[in-house]
Curated annotation (Swiss-Prot):
There is a cross-link at G1-N32 (Cyclopeptide (Gly-Asn)). The keyword Disulfide bond applies. This is a cyclic peptide. Belongs to the cyclotide family. Moebius subfamily. This is Cyclotide Hyfl-B.
Length: 32
């Protein structure tokens, strides 16, 4: 399936929830 969008957008290519498995993809933070 598709990645789940996290609760934030990216800020300068970084996600605040990266430690929870979220990564920056096309200005959105997605859980992979």
């Amino acid at each position: 399936g598709s990645p789940i969008q996290c609760a934030e957008t990216c800020f300068i290519g970084k996600c605040y929830t990266e430690e929870l498995g979220c990564t920056c993809t096309a200005f959105l933070c997605m859980k992979n």
